[in-house]
């Protein structure tokens, strides 16, 4: 399940950048299709993350923080695309997205189901 979760959020990250680029280039039809596929991957990421979260019986604060950071990351992904679609500035959203994404990945790798990088 861990590999499915990681694969789904990596694909979701790729789709965010593709959709952002399509919105930036003015290709609204392609961007809309990519955005809808990305929303499907949001659901897959949330479901696989919930399964990993519920796998343990003894939770601590790190598991809850990882789950919340994951949901916030998905929120930032969606805000980035909506702001780009509407032509609004997204600099602050980009900074928040990168910070929260890095925190989420580092915390995910630190937990027992993550890869032993740290």
UniProtKB/Swiss-Prot annotation:
The chain crosses the membrane at residues 6-26, 33-53, 62-82, 89-109. It holds the Pfam family DUF1516. Keywords: Cell membrane, Membrane, Transmembrane, Transmembrane helix. InterPro entries: UPF0344 (IPR010899). It comes from the Bacteria. It is found in: Cell membrane. It is a multi-pass membrane protein. Disulfide bonds: none annotated. GO terms for cellular component: plasma membrane. Belongs to the UPF0344 family. This is UPF0344 protein BLi01172/BL01343. It comes from Bacillus licheniformis (strain ATCC 14580 / DSM 13 / JCM 2505 / CCUG 7422 / NBRC 12200 / NCIMB 9375 / NCTC 10341 / NRRL NRS-1264 / Gibson 46).
């Amino acid at each position: 399940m861990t590999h499915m979760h990681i694969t789904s959020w990596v694909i979701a990250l790729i789709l965010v950048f593709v959709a952002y680029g399509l919105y930036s280039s003015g290709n609204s039809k392609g961007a809309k299709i990519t955005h809808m596929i990305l929303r499907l991957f949001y659901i897959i990421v949330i479901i696989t993350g919930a399964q990993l979260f519920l796998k343990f019986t003894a939770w601590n604060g790190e598991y809850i923080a990882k789950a919340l950071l994951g949901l916030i990351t998905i929120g930032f992904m969606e805000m980035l695309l909506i702001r780009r679609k509407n032509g609004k500035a997204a600099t602050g959203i980009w900074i928040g997205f990168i910070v929260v994404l890095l925190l989420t990945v580092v915390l995910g790798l630190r937990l027992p189901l993550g890869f032993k990088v740290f």
